[in-house]
Amino acid sequence: MFLRIRFALIIAICALLTACGGADRVGQANLVGQVNLAAAAPSVTTYYAASRLLEQASMGPSPSSVAQVRKYGIEAWIDAQQKLPPSVITTPANLLEFDDQNDRVLADLSWNTYRFNLQNIFLASEDQLRVRTSWVLSNFLVISTSKVKSYGGAEYMNLLQSNAFGNYSDLLKAISINPSMGTYLDNNQNNKWNLNENYGRELMQLFSVGLVQLNMDGSIKRDANGKALETYTQSDVIESTKALTGWNIATPNCGSTIKNCLNWANYGKPMVANEGAHNTDGKKLLGKTIPAGQTAVKDLESLIEILVTHPNTGPFVALRLIQGLTTSDPSPAYITRVATVFQNTKGDLKAVVKAVLMDSEARAGDVPGKSPAGFGRIKEPHLINTSLLRAMECPKAGTLTNTFNAWTQDPLNAKTVFNFYPPNHRAPSSKLLAPEQQMLTSEEFNMRLGRVSGAFWDPQARGLIEAGCNLDALSAAASASESEILNLISQRFFRGAMPAVTGQALLQSVNVNNNPLVKAGQMIDMALITPAFGVSK
């Protein structure tokens, strides 16, 4: 049954995101123009437009956030969001004290504390645009808590939050000497006598210049025979690695009360340079030279400067930010405009994120039916879950809101450095880029069904109470009439524009039951697997 549902949804998604374009950059026809900010934005922010923006720029619309966007307008809301201080996980000391894997009770306490605090940021933080940006960054600047544990995950999320609207050079420098990344990709204690190329390679391949040379529109440069031109060589990997040698996690000083002191105590601090282990030879990579005799800090700065100013990095980062915020298969013109902002501002992420969101292609769909052909993205499982909970006004982490054990995407815990899905994955039998589609499995659909109605079956509503959910409007609508509950579900989950056929499907999904909240929950369960909810278009 679930395989049939999955297949039907994929077909529907492909129909919603109709693609066209060439083999190298799939999307719409190349458009001519420079940065084009919100030329198509309506003068008054409608409910539909506000909800749509929040699907792109937050962890999901909530009634209060929709009202806020409508009050300030889209651009003013973005500007205000970018001025807010970062929300961070404020309990790393507890995580450190609890994270002793030899003690199962303390280990479980550590993981639960970490996950609840992380989920609180996703659900309830005021700086939702920053949080969404950090989420996107975490999906290509990858670590995994399976290796760095809960304390490392908390500190890495804090790092992303603190740098999400800063300069990309500063972000890469901070990541390069972050203990979580140093542990995950083996640059901690990397020395000139025994080079480990892991981080030096991934810093280029996944974090900056990529494997193949790109034009500004994201298309691949090719030689006369049509072969893709490689960005770097094995020699470049070695030279990059030499520039990164000599960094160690600082020696901890946390007293005798913390059992895992030696492993985790300084994960919240940058690694420190051991100049004796640093390679001071001159380095040549990507056509540039790093002078001999420099310190580990200076070599790192020189390396990052080479990578961030490389002509590939603008379109490389632009594509990943666009894919994570607005559309999986952006047009060449859209990529060009955002990449141009990246290059002109030398990697100012605040300006780049705003350019992604305010581009005319991103905002055209604020008028229903006006999205460019092929525009949109499939919501990944974690975003579906946070969108559900924010729509239901559930602001706190708890049994109900803890997605990590129940659903198929554990934030900051991808199985490999290549993330949960590759950015170049294409929908079946289509040229359409659809990375998140790879996570649409029968298991994932199965986990959506019954989640909300199951919570309402509990007569004590323990999960709902623990999560602080505000169910007043839902309860009133469910008790009033079918039309009232359909209208509320349309507002909360479909931007106020639920298709009529979807409404009929929701009504038909309800089992005979006298509890109006259970009925509402069954309808929401079904809403979660509809293409109209699962695709942000």
Which role fits each region the language model picked out?
Residues 16-19:
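C-terminal motif of bacterial Sec signal peptides marking the signal peptidase cleavage site
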Residues 21-24:
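Bacterial signal peptide processing site
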Residues 51-58, 310-345, 354-537:
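Flexible, low-complexity segments enriched for small/polar residues
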Residues 70, 82, 97-100, 111-118, ...:
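Active-site substrate-binding loop specific to GH73 endo-beta-N-acetylglucosaminidase modules
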